[in-house]
């Protein structure tokens, strides 16, 4: 049968495989493409095609990530798979590959391992909304009681990190059996069950355009006779001419009205997520606005100076620091379009942070930034990126 062209009419969702090294993340990714290819929803990608992941740069950090796409009857998916543990850490913290949900792969033969725990913690910290579990390699386990034990362990681990461990779907199967065309009861049918669970359990993300308006300010001009224009790329939502907005961050929040929107020198009646626009703001002086602030729907985002973050610190080879740092370290935190100096407090029991570590830390900025949970930032010293992080929770 002729392969049907990917239809872009279905809702889109970004997912990825996470879990301990060698538990079968890449094999499962290959098995999903193989299974869905039979119904025209994917092009089969073999293990070695996925494993040879290209390097990409995100926020000054090099990350290897493989991207595959496929679709089920319900949704179109972009799926990320990383070759190494460090790539997962970097990917999740930088948000280079946004995940609306993830498939946690656990080997039934080994049970949860250190990186299983670490990936669940990272998923919690960076705000991955939902997980589905694939208990892989069940063909290597003869004892059904052992399988039940592993499932129980996984559920307890998920609950320990505030995921609903009792409710998360756990599918038991084998990626390898699927790839080798073995017993479909362990292989192909279980992969179909997994995708049904992903369809049903991972919520459809809200489209950026449906969220409250926010635009990071990149530049400010004054146009004689017209007033002040701020430019930037709309991150989310829609702004219409005549809308009241707030200018948030770095100084006291100001209310104003958008009196004009232009794009490529043409006047528009609105700007929406993804557009690079200039917004004319009423009664605002050129010196009252600066790069690093945001335009936002009133009340939708507030300025803060203190937060808890999850961060990855670059190795020397990645262009990062050569030496460790300690509590009271004062780098710059680059949010959206600007740097703000902040002080780092390490958690109790953590004496120092070595290049290559990922850590939880408390940060206090010297000036407030418009932020919400999940906001990404770079850690810089004199314009050079030495780390990346994500706001896990706001404390003040």
From Swiss-Prot:
Residues holding Mg(2+): 26
> What cellular-component terms does GO give this entry?
cytosol
**What are the tr-type G domain coordinates in residue numbering?**
10-206
Q: State the SUPFAM superfamilies in the record.
A: EF-Tu/eEF-1alpha/eIF2-gamma C-terminal domain, P-loop containing nucleoside triphosphate hydrolases, Translation proteins
One term of GO molecular function: translation elongation factor activity
The record's region (G1) falls at: 19-26
Q: What is its EC number?
A: 3.6.5.3
Task: Kindly state which reaction or reactions the protein catalyses.
Answer: GTP + H2O = GDP + phosphate + H(+)
Positions of region (G4): 136-139
The positions annotated for binding GTP are 19-26, 81-85, 136-139
Annotated region described as G5, given as residue ranges: 174-176
Q: Which PROSITE patterns match?
A: G_TR_1 (PS00301), G_TR_2 (PS51722)
> Which keywords does this chain's UniProt record carry?
Cytoplasm, Elongation factor, GTP-binding, Hydrolase, Magnesium, Metal-binding, Nucleotide-binding, Protein biosynthesis
Q: What class of enzyme is it?
A: hydrolase
One Pfam family for this entry, by name?
A: GTP_EFTU
Q: Where does the record place the region G2?
A: 60-64
InterPro entries in the cross-refs: EF-Tu_GTP-bd (IPR041709), EF-Tu_GTPase (IPR050055), EFTu-like_2 (IPR004161), EFTU_2 (IPR033720), G_TR_CS (IPR031157), P-loop_NTPase (IPR027417), Small_GTP-bd (IPR005225), T_Tr_GTP-bd_dom (IPR000795)
Where does the protein end up? Answer: Cytoplasm
Region labeled G3 — which residues?
81-84
- Family note: Belongs to the TRAFAC class translation factor GTPase superfamily. Classic translation factor GTPase family. EF-Tu/EF-1A subfamily.
Biological role? GTP hydrolase that promotes the GTP-dependent binding of aminoacyl-tRNA to the A-site of ribosomes during protein biosynthesis.
Subunit structure, briefly? Monomer.
* UniProt-listed NCBIfam families: EF-Tu, PRK00049.1, PRK12735.1, PRK12736.1, small_GTP
Descriptive protein name: Elongation factor Tu
User: What organism, scientifically named, is this protein from?
Assistant: Gluconacetobacter diazotrophicus (strain ATCC 49037 / DSM 5601 / CCUG 37298 / CIP 103539 / LMG 7603 / PAl5)
- Gene this protein is translated from: tuf
């Amino acid at each position: 049968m002729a392969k049907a062209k990917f239809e872009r009419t279905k809702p889109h969702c970004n997912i990825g495989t996470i879990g301990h090294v060698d538990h079968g993340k890449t094999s499962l990714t290959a098995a999903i493409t193989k299974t869905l290819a039979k119904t025209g929803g994917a092009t089969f990608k073999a293990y070695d095609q996925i494993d040879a992941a290209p390097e990409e740069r995100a926020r000054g950090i090099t990350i290897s990530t493989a991207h595959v796409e496929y679709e089920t009857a319900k949704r179109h998916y972009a799926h990320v798979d990383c070759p190494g543990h460090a790539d997962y850490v970097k990917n999740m913290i930088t948000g280079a590959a946004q995940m609306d949900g993830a498939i946690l792969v656990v080997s039934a033969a080994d049970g949860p391992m250190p990186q299983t725990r670490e990936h669940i913690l990272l998923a919690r910290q960076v705000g991955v909304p939902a997980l589905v579990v694939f208990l892989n390699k069940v063909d290597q386990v003869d004892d059904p009681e052992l399988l039940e034990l592993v499932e129980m362990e996984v559920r307890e681990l998920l609950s320990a990190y505030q995921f609903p461990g009792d409710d998360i779907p756990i599918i038991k199967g084998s990626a390898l059996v699927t790839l080798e065309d073995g017993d479909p009861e362990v292989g192909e049918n279980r992969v179909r069950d997994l995708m049904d669970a992903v369809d049903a359990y991972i919520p459809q993300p809200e489209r950026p355009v449906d969220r409250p308006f926010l635009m990071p300010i990149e530049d400010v001009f004054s146009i004689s006779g017209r007033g002040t224009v701020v430019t930037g790329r709309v991150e989310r939502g829609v702004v219409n001419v005549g809308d009241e907005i707030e200018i948030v961050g770095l100084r006291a929040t100001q209310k104003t009205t958008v009196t004009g929107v232009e794009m490529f020198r043409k006047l528009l009646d609105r700007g929406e997520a993804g557009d690079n626009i200039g917004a004319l703001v009423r009664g605002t002086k050129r010196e009252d606005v600066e790069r690093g602030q945001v335009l936002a729907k009133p009340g939708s985002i507030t300025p803060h100076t203190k937060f808890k973050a999850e961060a990855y610190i670059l190795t020397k080879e990645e262009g990062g620091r050569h030496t460790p740092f300690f509590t009271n370290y004062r780098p710059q935190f680059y949010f959206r379009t600007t740097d703000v100096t902040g002080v780092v407090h390490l958690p109790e029991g953590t004496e120092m942070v070595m290049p290559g570590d990922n850590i939880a830390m408390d940060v206090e900025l010297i000036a407030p930034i418009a932020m919400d949970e999940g906001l990404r930032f770079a850690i810089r010293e004199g314009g050079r990126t030495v780390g990346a992080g994500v706001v896990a929770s706001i404390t003040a």
